[in-house]
Amino acid sequence: MNKVFKFLDDTFLDLGRQFKWTYLPPLMVYVAAGISGLTGIVGTFFVKDYLNLSAAFLAGLGFWAGIPWALKMPLGHLVDLIWERKNYMVYFGATLIALSLLIMYGLIIHTEDMSQIYSVETWFVISVILAPVGYVVQDVVADAMTVEAVPLTNEKGNHYNKDEIKIMHTTMQTLGRFAIIGGTVLVALVNVILFRDVENLEQADKIQLYGSIYIYALIIPLFSRLGVIL
Protein backbone atom coordinates (compact mmCIF):
# COMPACT_ATOMS: atom_id res chain seq x y z
CA MET A 1 0.00 0.00 0.00
CA ASN A 2 2.84 2.36 0.85
CA LYS A 3 4.44 1.67 -2.53
CA VAL A 4 1.19 2.55 -4.30
CA PHE A 5 0.85 5.78 -2.32
CA LYS A 6 4.48 6.65 -3.02
CA PHE A 7 3.94 6.05 -6.74
CA LEU A 8 0.84 8.27 -6.78
CA ASP A 9 2.64 10.91 -4.74
CA ASP A 10 5.71 10.94 -6.98
CA THR A 11 3.69 10.79 -10.21
CA PHE A 12 0.71 13.05 -9.58
CA LEU A 13 0.76 14.90 -6.26
CA ASP A 14 4.32 16.07 -6.73
CA LEU A 15 3.24 17.84 -9.93
CA GLY A 16 0.93 19.99 -7.85
CA ARG A 17 3.73 20.85 -5.45
CA GLN A 18 5.97 21.86 -8.34
CA PHE A 19 3.31 24.11 -9.88
CA LYS A 20 4.29 27.74 -10.34
CA TRP A 21 1.96 30.62 -11.18
CA THR A 22 4.06 31.39 -14.25
CA TYR A 23 2.83 28.07 -15.68
CA LEU A 24 -0.80 29.25 -15.67
CA PRO A 25 -0.97 31.27 -18.96
CA PRO A 26 0.04 28.42 -21.31
CA LEU A 27 -2.01 25.95 -19.25
CA MET A 28 -5.12 28.07 -19.86
CA VAL A 29 -4.53 27.82 -23.60
CA TYR A 30 -4.02 24.06 -23.31
CA VAL A 31 -7.28 23.73 -21.36
CA ALA A 32 -9.01 25.58 -24.19
CA ALA A 33 -7.57 23.00 -26.60
CA GLY A 34 -8.82 20.20 -24.37
CA ILE A 35 -12.40 21.46 -24.27
CA SER A 36 -12.46 22.16 -28.01
CA GLY A 37 -14.30 18.87 -28.56
CA LEU A 38 -17.42 20.19 -26.83
CA THR A 39 -19.22 20.73 -30.14
CA GLY A 40 -18.07 17.50 -31.77
CA ILE A 41 -21.28 15.54 -31.17
CA VAL A 42 -23.49 18.46 -32.20
CA GLY A 43 -21.49 18.89 -35.39
CA THR A 44 -22.03 15.23 -36.25
CA PHE A 45 -25.79 15.51 -35.73
CA PHE A 46 -25.89 18.71 -37.80
CA VAL A 47 -24.13 17.10 -40.75
CA LYS A 48 -26.40 14.05 -40.57
CA ASP A 49 -29.71 15.89 -40.14
CA TYR A 50 -29.29 19.15 -42.05
CA LEU A 51 -26.63 18.80 -44.73
CA ASN A 52 -26.76 16.81 -47.92
CA LEU A 53 -23.03 16.29 -48.25
CA SER A 54 -21.42 13.21 -49.72
CA ALA A 55 -18.85 11.13 -47.88
CA ALA A 56 -16.26 12.10 -50.51
CA PHE A 57 -16.92 15.80 -49.93
CA LEU A 58 -16.64 15.42 -46.15
CA ALA A 59 -13.39 13.48 -46.57
CA GLY A 60 -12.00 16.25 -48.76
CA LEU A 61 -13.13 18.86 -46.25
CA GLY A 62 -11.37 16.93 -43.51
CA PHE A 63 -8.18 17.05 -45.57
CA TRP A 64 -8.33 20.84 -45.94
CA ALA A 65 -9.18 21.25 -42.27
CA GLY A 66 -6.01 19.33 -41.44
CA ILE A 67 -3.75 21.57 -43.54
CA PRO A 68 -3.27 24.17 -40.74
CA TRP A 69 -1.84 21.47 -38.45
CA ALA A 70 0.64 20.51 -41.17
CA LEU A 71 1.80 24.14 -41.18
CA LYS A 72 2.45 24.18 -37.43
CA MET A 73 6.25 24.30 -37.76
CA PRO A 74 6.46 27.36 -40.06
CA LEU A 75 3.85 29.04 -37.87
CA GLY A 76 6.12 28.35 -34.90
CA HIS A 77 8.92 30.20 -36.70
CA LEU A 78 6.55 33.11 -37.33
CA VAL A 79 5.70 33.24 -33.62
CA ASP A 80 9.42 33.38 -32.80
CA LEU A 81 9.83 36.35 -35.15
CA ILE A 82 6.98 38.34 -33.60
CA TRP A 83 7.27 36.98 -30.06
CA GLU A 84 6.76 40.37 -28.41
CA ARG A 85 3.32 40.51 -30.03
CA LYS A 86 2.34 36.93 -29.20
CA ASN A 87 -0.80 38.14 -27.43
CA TYR A 88 -2.15 39.33 -30.78
CA MET A 89 -1.63 35.84 -32.18
CA VAL A 90 -3.72 34.35 -29.38
CA TYR A 91 -6.41 37.00 -29.87
CA PHE A 92 -6.40 36.25 -33.59
CA GLY A 93 -6.78 32.52 -32.99
CA ALA A 94 -9.51 33.06 -30.39
CA THR A 95 -11.39 35.35 -32.78
CA LEU A 96 -11.33 32.71 -35.54
CA ILE A 97 -12.61 30.07 -33.12
CA ALA A 98 -15.38 32.38 -31.88
CA LEU A 99 -16.40 33.17 -35.47
CA SER A 100 -16.54 29.47 -36.30
CA LEU A 101 -18.75 28.77 -33.27
CA LEU A 102 -21.06 31.72 -33.97
CA ILE A 103 -21.48 30.63 -37.59
CA MET A 104 -22.57 27.18 -36.46
CA TYR A 105 -24.92 28.71 -33.88
CA GLY A 106 -26.45 30.86 -36.61
CA LEU A 107 -26.82 27.89 -38.94
CA ILE A 108 -28.70 25.90 -36.32
CA ILE A 109 -30.89 28.61 -34.78
CA HIS A 110 -31.26 31.06 -37.69
CA THR A 111 -30.96 28.73 -40.66
CA GLU A 112 -33.25 30.68 -43.01
CA ASP A 113 -31.57 34.03 -42.34
CA MET A 114 -28.09 32.58 -42.86
CA SER A 115 -29.10 30.76 -46.05
CA GLN A 116 -30.21 34.05 -47.62
CA ILE A 117 -26.58 35.20 -47.59
CA TYR A 118 -24.78 31.96 -48.49
CA SER A 119 -25.90 28.37 -48.74
CA VAL A 120 -25.90 26.31 -45.55
CA GLU A 121 -23.15 24.11 -46.97
CA THR A 122 -20.95 27.13 -47.70
CA TRP A 123 -21.34 28.46 -44.16
CA PHE A 124 -20.51 25.01 -42.80
CA VAL A 125 -17.31 24.82 -44.87
CA ILE A 126 -16.24 28.29 -43.68
CA SER A 127 -16.82 27.27 -40.06
CA VAL A 128 -14.91 24.00 -40.45
CA ILE A 129 -11.90 25.78 -41.99
CA LEU A 130 -11.79 28.68 -39.50
CA ALA A 131 -11.72 26.55 -36.34
CA PRO A 132 -8.50 24.55 -36.97
CA VAL A 133 -6.65 27.69 -38.08
CA GLY A 134 -7.56 29.30 -34.75
CA TYR A 135 -6.58 26.24 -32.73
CA VAL A 136 -3.24 25.83 -34.51
CA VAL A 137 -2.30 29.48 -33.97
CA GLN A 138 -3.11 29.20 -30.27
CA ASP A 139 -1.34 25.86 -29.91
CA VAL A 140 1.85 27.21 -31.48
CA VAL A 141 1.86 30.21 -29.14
CA ALA A 142 1.13 28.00 -26.12
CA ASP A 143 4.07 25.73 -26.99
CA ALA A 144 6.35 28.76 -27.12
CA MET A 145 4.89 30.16 -23.89
CA THR A 146 5.89 27.01 -22.02
CA VAL A 147 9.54 28.01 -22.46
CA GLU A 148 8.90 31.52 -21.18
CA ALA A 149 6.86 30.17 -18.25
CA VAL A 150 9.88 28.48 -16.65
CA PRO A 151 11.62 31.02 -14.36
CA LEU A 152 15.40 31.32 -14.41
CA THR A 153 15.68 32.69 -10.85
CA ASN A 154 13.97 31.84 -7.56
CA GLU A 155 12.19 34.17 -5.14
CA LYS A 156 15.52 35.26 -3.67
CA GLY A 157 16.95 36.17 -7.07
CA ASN A 158 19.32 33.22 -7.22
CA HIS A 159 19.69 31.46 -10.57
CA TYR A 160 18.44 27.89 -10.93
CA ASN A 161 20.99 25.36 -12.15
CA LYS A 162 20.58 23.45 -15.42
CA ASP A 163 19.14 20.35 -13.75
CA GLU A 164 16.49 22.37 -11.91
CA ILE A 165 15.52 24.19 -15.10
CA LYS A 166 15.29 20.88 -16.98
CA ILE A 167 12.99 19.47 -14.28
CA MET A 168 10.77 22.56 -14.47
CA HIS A 169 10.51 22.26 -18.25
CA THR A 170 9.50 18.61 -17.86
CA THR A 171 6.92 19.57 -15.24
CA MET A 172 5.53 22.31 -17.49
CA GLN A 173 5.14 19.93 -20.42
CA THR A 174 3.53 17.27 -18.22
CA LEU A 175 1.07 19.77 -16.76
CA GLY A 176 0.25 20.88 -20.29
CA ARG A 177 -0.65 17.32 -21.27
CA PHE A 178 -2.76 16.98 -18.11
CA ALA A 179 -4.54 20.25 -18.96
CA ILE A 180 -5.47 18.93 -22.40
CA ILE A 181 -6.56 15.55 -21.04
CA GLY A 182 -8.49 17.20 -18.21
CA GLY A 183 -10.33 19.42 -20.67
CA THR A 184 -11.18 16.40 -22.82
CA VAL A 185 -12.55 14.45 -19.84
CA LEU A 186 -14.57 17.47 -18.74
CA VAL A 187 -16.09 17.77 -22.21
CA ALA A 188 -17.04 14.08 -22.17
CA LEU A 189 -18.86 14.52 -18.85
CA VAL A 190 -20.63 17.66 -20.06
CA ASN A 191 -21.77 15.92 -23.25
CA VAL A 192 -23.16 13.00 -21.24
CA ILE A 193 -25.17 15.43 -19.11
CA LEU A 194 -26.37 17.65 -21.97
CA PHE A 195 -27.38 14.80 -24.28
CA ARG A 196 -29.11 12.77 -21.60
CA ASP A 197 -32.64 11.88 -22.81
CA VAL A 198 -32.13 13.99 -25.94
CA GLU A 199 -34.02 11.39 -27.99
CA ASN A 200 -37.18 12.25 -26.02
CA LEU A 201 -37.05 15.95 -26.92
CA GLU A 202 -39.19 17.59 -29.56
CA GLN A 203 -37.38 18.70 -32.72
CA ALA A 204 -37.58 22.38 -31.74
CA ASP A 205 -36.10 21.61 -28.32
CA LYS A 206 -33.29 19.61 -29.92
CA ILE A 207 -32.43 22.55 -32.16
CA GLN A 208 -32.32 24.88 -29.16
CA LEU A 209 -30.08 22.42 -27.31
CA TYR A 210 -27.71 22.11 -30.26
CA GLY A 211 -27.50 25.88 -30.60
CA SER A 212 -26.95 26.45 -26.88
CA ILE A 213 -23.95 24.10 -26.90
CA TYR A 214 -22.22 26.34 -29.43
CA ILE A 215 -22.89 29.30 -27.14
CA TYR A 216 -21.44 27.36 -24.19
CA ALA A 217 -18.42 26.58 -26.36
CA LEU A 218 -17.54 30.28 -26.53
CA ILE A 219 -15.79 29.62 -23.23
CA ILE A 220 -13.01 28.07 -25.35
CA PRO A 221 -11.68 31.35 -26.83
CA LEU A 222 -12.37 33.01 -23.47
CA PHE A 223 -10.00 30.59 -21.72
CA SER A 224 -7.22 31.24 -24.22
CA ARG A 225 -7.64 35.02 -23.97
CA LEU A 226 -7.46 34.79 -20.19
CA GLY A 227 -4.21 32.89 -20.60
CA VAL A 228 -2.67 35.91 -22.34
CA ILE A 229 -4.17 38.46 -19.93
CA LEU A 230 -2.81 36.57 -16.92
Where are these regions (language model features)?
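Small-residue-mediated transmembrane helix hinge/kink sites in multi-pass secondary transporters
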Residues: 45, 73-80, 188-193
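Conserved glycine-rich helix-kink/hinge and helix-boundary motifs of the Major Facilitator Superfamily
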Residues: 27, 59-60, 91, 167-174
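Structural signature of the two symmetry-related core transmembrane helices
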Residues: 87-104
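Residue-level signature of the transmembrane alpha-helical core
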Residues: 27-31, 63, 94-95, 129, ...
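Central cavity-lining transmembrane alpha-helices of secondary-active solute carriers
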Residues: 59-82, 94, 98-99
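Helix-loop boundary and gating motifs at the non-cytosolic
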Residues: 2-69, 130
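Intracellular loop-helix junctions on the cytosolic face of multi-pass helical membrane proteins
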Residues: 1-22, 99, 103, 108-125, ...
